């Protein structure tokens, strides 16, 4: 794998990892609540910063899940084959992500060309820019939307998918070239450096506030925390007190929830603190909850996360994340964007995307390459 042939040790996870679909469902529901709260017809009590900012926490859950899952799959492949096939990895990612994403991007562009929607309106400035639609399209197609600060709503949410794609481009190469031990150090370095980068951006960078939650160098510690959790999974199991804490039916959920709550509260009170250290608290809380649920599917929380209806929402979470955006648009007051019909339309469009785009391409991947058709991406 490297010139020194450093061994990558697999985590003690095999087969389908329990609770991940449930975590995805929880994540995407946070996004839906955060977005629907500001739409026309929604109860007035929902249109508060404490509710509308829930979407950021939901996306951060997705990033932790992605780092954990992708690292687990790569380590598992190395344990099975003695190497990681980067070509096959990127082919699997392409089958999983690109069809639904490009279908959404293309249909939104078609709706714009037909005059049904407006891609020239900037959400941050509320200004019209006739040159903006093409810029938004190019950022979306090249997965650089996380650096498009003057965004339009319809392509806005693709910033998180852009972060995921940038992670996919970098992390597998780190594992292959550096090996397990050095990759562990890289993940730790990212966790330690990202808060300092956010601090430098706050003190000296002339950047909009949105950059702290979207630009890769500012948010990579969330992904790195998930990677680290996968690489240390077996070692944590060998620590009796740590394992007892993580498998306790209440303690990890309480501690994780308190950490996330502290980060959440800091974002409402002190934006600089939230940018620098609040995100660290949030990452720690999420990774504790993630470790609890994948280790303890038999606890009350684990059973909820693995219920069939919950797992179905989790399986549909990628399409649901893609298609909620045009219906949960707070600047448009139309029949399709009014609560609660906008939620029903979001789920309906997501089911169509999942049933007729995602699943056929996953089956095609299985038929051509022999990999399971089950969704394995951490993307929203």
Map each language-model feature to its residues.
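Functionally critical transmembrane alpha-helices in membrane proteins and complexes, commonly lining
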Residues: 16-76, 95-101, 135-138, 142-144, ...
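Membrane-interfacial alpha-helical segments at the cytosolic side of multi-pass membrane proteins
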Residues: 30-35, 68-72, 106-110, 167-180, ...
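Alpha-helical transmembrane segments of multi-pass integral membrane proteins
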Residues: 56, 223, 227-228, 248-360
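Transmembrane alpha-helical segments and their boundary/interface "anchor" motifs
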Residues: 56-59, 75-117, 127-133, 139, ...
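Structural signal for the C-terminal ends of transmembrane alpha-helices
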Residues: 71-79, 111-114, 176-181, 228-238, ...
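Solvent-exposed interhelical
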Residues: 165-193, 202, 231-251
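Membrane-proximal cytoplasmic C-terminal regulatory module of class A 7TM GPCRs
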Residues: 305-309, 360-380
């Amino acid at each position: 794998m490297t010139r020194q042939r450093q061994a990558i040790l697999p985590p003690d996870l095999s087969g389908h990892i329990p609770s991940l679909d449930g975590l995805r469902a929880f994540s995407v529901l946070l996004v839906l609540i955060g977005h629907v709260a500001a739409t026309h017809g929604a109860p007035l009590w929902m249109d508060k910063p404490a509710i509308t900012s829930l979407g950021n926490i939901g996306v951060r859950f997705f990033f932790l899940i992605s780092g954990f899952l992708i690292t687990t799959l790569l380590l598992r492949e190395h344990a099975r084959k003695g190497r990681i096939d980067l070509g096959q990895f990127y082919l699997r990612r392409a089958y999983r992500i690109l069809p639904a994403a490009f279908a959404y991007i293309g249909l939104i562009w078609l709706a714009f060309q037909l005059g049904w929607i407006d891609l020239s309106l900037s959400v941050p400035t509320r200004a019209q820019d006739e040159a903006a639609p093409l810029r938004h399209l190019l950022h979306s197609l090249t997965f650089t939307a996380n650096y498009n600060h003057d965004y339009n709503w319809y392509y806005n949410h693709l910033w998180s998918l852009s972060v995921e794609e940038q992670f996919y481009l970098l992390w597998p190469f780190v594992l292959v070239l550096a090996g397990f031990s050095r990759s562990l150090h890289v993940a730790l370095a990212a966790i330690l450096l990202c808060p300092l980068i956010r601090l430098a951006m706050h003190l000296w960078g002339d950047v909009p506030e949105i950059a702290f939650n979207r630009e890769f160098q500012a948010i990579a510690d969330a992904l790195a925390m998930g990677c680290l959790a996968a690489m240390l999974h077996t070692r944590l199991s060998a620590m009796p007190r740590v394992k007892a804490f993580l498998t306790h039916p209440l303690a990890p959920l309480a501690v994780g929830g308190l950490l996330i709550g502290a980060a959440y509260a800091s974002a409402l009170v002190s934006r600089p603190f939230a940018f620098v250290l609040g995100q660290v608290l949030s990452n720690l809380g999420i990774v504790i909850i993630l470790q609890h649920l994948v280790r303890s599917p038999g606890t009350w929380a684990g059973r909820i996360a693995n219920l069939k209806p919950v797992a179905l929402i989790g399986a549909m979470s990628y399409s649901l994340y893609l298609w909620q955006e045009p219906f949960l648009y707070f600047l448009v007051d139309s029949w399709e964007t009014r609560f609660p019909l906008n939620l029903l339309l979001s789920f309906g469009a997501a089911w169509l995307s999942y049933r007729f785009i995602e699943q056929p391409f996953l089956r095609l991947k299985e038929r051509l390459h022999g990999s399971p058709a089950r969704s394995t991406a951490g993307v929203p």
